[in-house]
Design a protein with these regions (language model features):
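Bacterial N-terminal signal peptides that target proteins for export
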Residues: 1-10
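C-terminal motif of bacterial Sec signal peptides marking the signal peptidase cleavage site
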Residues: 17-19
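Acidic, metal/ion-coordinating pockets
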Residues: 21-357, 429-430, 434, 586, ...
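Feature captures C-terminal
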Residues: 32, 36-44, 54, 62-69, ...
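Short, solvent-exposed aromatic-acidic interface loops
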Residues: 218, 351-368, 560-563
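Short, cationic low-complexity segments
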Residues: 236-242, 357-378, 595-610
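Mature, solvent-exposed C-terminal subdomains and processed small-chain segments of exported/organellar
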Residues: 378-381, 497
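Glycine-rich phosphate/diphosphate-binding loops and the adjacent beta-loop-alpha structural elements
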Residues: 399-420
Length: 677
C-alpha cells in the first residue's frame, strides 16, 4: 500500500497533525503471534460516499452557505467517531472527484498540473483515509485525468505512464480492465495492516495487529454512461464475477477481515453481470466480511430497504454481512460498530454485538410531528477545511460569476414535473442550434430530417428544498449555465423513428404514478422511484399529452410534429446527451448504435455559448412548452411536493391549476394539481 505521509505547512500544521495522528502508519509485516481465544476488539468502520467534491458547505448556484451538506461538516463527525471509538478505519466508496463547480473548475477550466493534488483529495489526506474505490462519475472527465489525479499509471490508449500527485491512501477497483493487457487499471485489492487495542476476558488490554483486505467495485454500466471515454480502452466485469475471481488471492494472504467497497446499492432482481446495484448479491460471495455501499444517494440502514429479502434494516445487515451506505454530498457518515472476537486462533465477527448506523450532519428535529432538517441543528463545520481549499474555492466562484448576458425570463425547475419547461427550453434551444450546424456538414443526407431535442431537469428537489434550478431575470453568468445544466455531459444526437420517439416519451412518463379518478382521497402524482433526471421532455416542434390515468407504457397521446400526427415510421434526429444516447436510464432503443453525432463539446459549454449569442434572452428566443397532462377529473386531490411558497412561479409560467395546500415546515410544501384544466 502507499506509505501515508503528512506534508505540513505552517498554515495547516495542527489540522494535518491531528488527521495523521489518528491513523497510524501501517506496520511492517510481522511473524504470526499467538493471541488468546476470547480476546475482543471493537472497531468502527467509517464510510463516506458520493461526496461529489462538495468540500465546503456552499451552494454555488444560489451563492450562499448551505450547512446541510459539505465534507467540512462530515469531518466533524469523523473526529467525533475517532474520539468515541478506540479503533477505527475510514473508507470512501467513490463518486468523489466530480459533481461540484469546484470539481469542474479543476478538471476543465484551470486544470491542475501533474504536481498538484486535487482539492478533495487534499482534504481527505488531511483527515486520513485508509482506502477507497472508484465511482462511476470518476470516469466523467476521461481516463487521462483520472490517471493523473489518482496517481495511477494505466496501460490504456491515450493515458501516460507518469505518476502524478494523488491521494495518500490506496484506491482499489477489481472490475475494470485494460483492453491492452486485460489487467485491472487500478489495484483490484490490497492489504492494509493496523494495530488495534483489544481486551482479554479479564479486562487486560493488548495491542494486536490486524490484516485488513479491501477490494473495490464500480457499476458495470459505466461502459454505457461514459462510452466516449471508455470504449475500446477498458472492459468491465460484473461485481460478483470480479469478487469470485480475486477472493482466492485475498484468502491466500490470510487476512483477518475482508471489506468490500462497492460504489453501488442493492437490487434483488435476478442477477446480471451488468447490474448497476449489485450489493445484495455481492454480500453473498463467501469470504466478504463487511460491505460498504454507495451510488444510490440514500442511507442504509434506512426505510428504503425495509422490505428487501434477507436485509436487516434496523441493525444494518445484508444477507448476514454488516453493511452501511452513508448518504451523499457529505450529509452523513456511515458507521459500522464491528465487534470482533478471537476464536480458534482467528478473528470472527460477533454479530450479536455488531450493528450499523448512519450519522447525519443535521440530525432531524420534530416539526408538527414530522422529522425535519433544520440548519440550526447541524454539527459545526471543521474550521480547518476552509484553510486547505479556500483559495481554489474562491477562484472557482470567481470563474462561474463571469458575465455572459442578460435574461428577461425566470428559468426554474420547481414545477418541471408538472409542465414548466422554462429551465429546459434554453438547453433544448442550444442543443438544436448546435446539432443543426454540425449535421449540415457531417450528414448532408439528413438535411430534411427534423431535429428536435430532449432534456431533463437535473435538480427537482431530491436533495432538499434548495435543490432546484432557479435562474432569475437579470444578469446571466457561467454559474447560470451550470445551474441550468448540472452534469458535465457531452452533446449527442441519435436517429430514431416515430415509434422510437413515442417509446422514449413513454419511458419518461414513468415519472408519474397511475392516478385513479374514482379515488376520493389524496393520490401522489410523482413516482419517487423514478429519478427526475430521467424525465426527458422533448421540444422543437413536437407536442403531446400525458394521460396519468393510463398504465405505464400507454400514456402518450396526441403525439404530433408541427401540428401533424407523427407516424411510427417517421424519421427524427433527437439531440440529447452521451449518457442517454449510450443507454443511461434504460430507455428503449437507446444503446449507442443509432448515434449520428457525438460532439466533443460539453452540453454546458454549448449552452453558455448559446446564451452569449443571445445577449438579452427573452421568450421569443425559447421554444414553447411541448406537453401537458390529458384532462382528467378526479374525485379526490392529486398532490405532489415541491419547495414551499412557489405558487406564483407556477402561475407566471401559465400553470394556473396548481395551488399550495399545506406547508411542511421544512422548506417544502404539498401542492394540489387540478388535472381537469
Amino acid at each position: 500500500m502507499p506509505h501515508r505521509s503528512c506534508r505540513l505547512t505552517a498554515l495547516i500544521t495542527a489540522f494535518l497533525l491531528a488527521g495523521c495522528a489518528s491513523q497510524p502508519h501501517a506496520p511492517q509485516p510481522q511473524a504470526p503471534q499467538h493471541l488468546p481465544d476470547g480476546l475482543r476488539a471493537d472497531v468502527a468502520v467509517l464510510e463516506t460516499t458520493d461526496l461529489h467534491s462538495n468540500i465546503l458547505s456552499y451552494d454555488y448556484y444560489k451563492q450562499k452557505a448551505d450547512p446541510t451538506l459539505g465534507f467540512e461538516h462530515t469531518v466533524t463527525l469523523i473526529r467525533k467517531a475517532r474520539g468515541e471509538f478506540t479503533n477505527s478505519l475510514l473508507f470512501d466508496a467513490g463518486d468523489t472527484i466530480q459533481g461540484s463547480v469546484l470539481a469542474d473548475y479543476q478538471a476543465q477550466v484551470q486544470k491542475i498540473d501533474c504536481g498538484q493534488e486535487l482539492a478533495i483529495y487534499k482534504v481527505m489526506d488531511a483527515i486520513g483515509y485508509d482506502g477507497g474505490t472508484i465511482g462511476n462519475h470518476e470516469f466523467n472527465y476521461g481516463l487521462p485525468f483520472l490517471s493523473q489525479v489518482t496517481s495511477t499509471p494505466m496501460n490504456v490508449d491515450g493515458v501516460g505512464a507518469q505518476r502524478c500527485a494523488g491521494p495518500h491512501y490506496p484506491l482499489v477497483l477489481a472490475n475494470v480492465n485494460s483492453v491492452r493487457d486485460g489487467q485491472p487499471i487500478f489495484k483490484p485489492w490490497t492489504i492494509i495492516e493496523r494495530k488495534f487495542a483489544a481486551f482479554t476476558p479479564d479486562g487486560s488490554q493488548l495491542s494486536v495487529p490486524l490484516k485488513i483486505a479491501i477490494i473495490g467495485f464500480t457499476p458495470p454500466p459505466i461502459m454505457q454512461w461514459d462510452k466516449q471515454n471508455l470504449e475500446g480502452k477498458v472492459t468491465v466485469t460484473g461485481v460478483v464475477e470480479a469478487a469470485q475471481k480475486y477472493m482466492p488471492e485475498i484468502e491466500a494472504q490470510h487476512p483477518d477481515l475482508v471489506i468490500a467497497i462497492l460504489h453501488g446499492g442493492m437490487n434483488t432482481a435476478p442477477y446480471t453481470s451488468d447490474m448497476e446495484n449489485g450489493g445484495w448479491y455481492l454480500a453473498g460471495v463467501p469470504g466478504i466480511d463487511v460491505l460498504l455501499l454507495g451510488h444510490e444517494h440514500t442511507d442504509f440502514p434506512g426505510p428504503r430497504f425495509a422490505t428487501m429479502q434477507d436485509v436487516d434494516d434496523q441493525r444494518g445487515f445484508v444477507r448476514g454481512v454488516p453493511a452501511v451506505m452513508g448518504g451523499f454530498f457529505g450529509k452523513d457518515l456511515g458507521v459500522i460498530r464491528l465487534a470482533l472476537v478471537r476464536q480458534q486462533n482467528r478473528w470472527t465477527i460477533d454479530k450479536s454485538k455488531t450493528f450499523s448506523q448512519v450519522w447525519p450532519i443535521c440530525p432531524p428535529v420534530m416539526v408538527g410531528g414530522k422529522p425535519t432538517i433544520a440548519a440550526s441543528n447541524c454539527v459545526p463545520a471543521d474550521p480547518q477545511v476552509q484553510l486547505v481549499v479556500g483559495k481554489v474555492q474562491q477562484a472557482a466562484i470567481d470563474y462561474v460569476n463571469t458575465p455572459i448576458g442578460q435574461s428577461t425570463v425566470r428559468m426554474s425547475s420547481y414545477f418541471a414535473d408538472e409542465g414548466d419547461m422554462s429551465a429546459l427550453a434554453p438547453v433544448n434551444a442550444a442543443q438544436i442550434d448546435y446539432a443543426q450546424q454540425e449535421l449540415s456538414s457531417a450528414h448532408p443526407e439528413l438535411a430534411k430530417v427534423p431535429v428536435v431535442a430532449s432534456a431533463a431537469a437535473f435538480r427537482t428537489g431530491f436533495g432538499g428544498p434548495d435543490d432546484y434550478t432557479d435562474v432569475m431575470p437579470g444578469p446571466l453568468t457561467l454559474r447560470s449555465a451550470a445551474d441550468l445544466y448540472f452534469y458535465p455531459n457531452t452533446l449527442t444526437a441519435v436517429k430514431i423513428d416515430g415509434a422510437g420517439l413515442k417509446a422514449w416519451l413513454e419511458k419518461s412518463a414513468e415519472r408519474f404514478n397511475r392516478i385513479d379518478p374514482n379515488v376520493s382521497g389524496e393520490q401522489l402524482l410523482i413516482n419517487e422511484k423514478y429519478a427526475g433526471f430521467n424525465f426527458d421532455q422533448i421540444q422543437g416542434g413536437v407536442t403531446y399529452t400525458i394521460d396519468v390515468s393510463k398504465p405505464a407504457g400507454q400514456r402518450i397521446e396526441k403525439l404530433s410534429f408541427r401540428g401533424k400526427h407523427i407516424t411510427p415510421s417517421q424519421t427524427f434526429v433527437v439531440v440529447t446527451n452521451n449518457y442517454r444516447a449510450s443507454g443511461g436510464g434504460h430507455f428503449p432503443g437507446l444503446d449507442g448504435n443509432n448515434v449520428v453525432l457525438a460532439a466533443p463539446d460539453g452540453t454546458r459549454e454549448i449552452l453558455a455559448r448559446w446564451l452569449q449569442a443571445h445577449p438579452t434572452l427573452g421568450t421569443k428566443d425559447l421554444p414553447s412548452a411541448s406537453w401537458h397532462f390529458a384532462r382528467l377529473k378526479t374525485r379526490g386531490t392529486v398532490v405532489f411536493t415541491a419547495a414551499s411558497d412557489k405558487q406564483t412561479v407556477a402561475e407566471a409560467d401559465g400553470l394556473h391549476n396548481i395551488r399550495q395546500l399545506r406547508d411542511n415546515g421544512d422548506g417544502t410544501a404539498v401542492y394540489a394539481i387540478d388535472l381537469s384544466h
